Structure formats: structure tokens, C-alpha cells
């Protein structure tokens, strides 16, 4: 199960992981509640991988964390790589310009998180 932590615990964990997912959620948010089992399953899957971690921060309790991280909607999963906010380059389809990703917003399937993990860990397949 993904551990619900304080912002201080997020800061401490960032330096320990190559890739850290931080789920910004609130107990009244139905999409947040629907995302929880997806992240719990991924957390279990990667439990033995010290490079990948999952945490969650209750934005109803830790309002300043949400403000500091420009959280304007939830669920919002912040991405940290090597202890810093992520800057993951994503190739867009068609003629669209590539873009940089630092968070996943909304209810997303496990495959989206798996894609980020493979991209950051260098295990992408074409």
C-alpha cells in the first residue's frame, strides 16, 4: 500500500530514489480513490526495486504543499527524477511538438506509469 506522508517525508525520500511518484490526493476526491488501487498495485510490483518509489500526500491536510507544487486539480501525481522535479521528454504523435512531463494529471491506467518507469529507467522498447 502506498504510504501517506508529510511533505518533509517526500523531501527525504526524493534523494533515495531515481524515480519517485507522489500522488497528490484528497479523501473526498472519487478519481483519487479510484487511482489508489492502481498505485498500490504498482507499489507492490516495484517493492523490490529501490530506484522506484510511490508516496501520497493528502492535499486537504497539506495545503501548502499543493500550493508550492502548483496543484490545481487532483488526482495529480508529481514525478521526481534524481531528487528533482522531473523533466521527461515525450514524443508527441503526428506533427505535434514533443513536450516535457513533470506530472500525470487525472485518473490514468497503470500503463501510463509503466511507460514513465521504462522511459526514466532506460528500458523503453519501440
Residues of each region from the PLM?
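Short active-site neighborhood of thiol/selenol oxidoreductases, capturing the structured segment around
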Residues: 15-27
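Thiol-based oxidoreductase modules, predominantly thioredoxin-like and allied folds used
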Residues: 2-6, 24, 35-65
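N-terminal "domain-start" segment that seeds a small globular fold
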Residues: 1-12, 113
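Short cysteine clusters
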Residues: 29-32
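CheY-like receiver
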Residues: 12-13, 65, 116
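A short glycine-leucine-enriched loop at secondary-structure breakpoints
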Residues: 68-72
Amino acid at each position: 500500500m502506498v504510504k501517506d506522508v508529510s511533505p518533509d517525508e517526500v523531501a527525504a525520500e526524493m534523494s533515495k530514489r531515481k524515480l519517485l511518484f507522489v500522488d497528490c490526493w484528497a479523501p473526498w476526491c472519487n478519481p483519487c480513490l479510484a487511482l489508489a488501487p492502481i498505485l498500490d498495485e504498482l507499489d507492490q510490483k516495484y517493492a523490490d526495486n529501490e530506484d522506484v518509489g510511490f508516496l501520497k500526500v493528502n492535499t486537504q491536510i497539506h495545503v501548502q504543499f499543493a500550493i508550492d507544487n502548483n496543484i490545481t486539480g487532483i488526482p495529480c501525481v508529481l514525478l521526481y527524477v534524481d531528487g528533482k522535479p522531473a523533466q521527461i521528454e515525450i514524443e508527441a504523435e503526428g506533427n505535434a511538438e514533443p513536450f516535457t512531463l513533470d506530472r500525470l494529471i487525472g485518473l490514468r491506467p497503470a500503463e501510463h506509469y509503466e511507460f514513465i518507469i521504462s522511459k526514466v529507467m532506460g528500458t523503453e522498447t519501440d
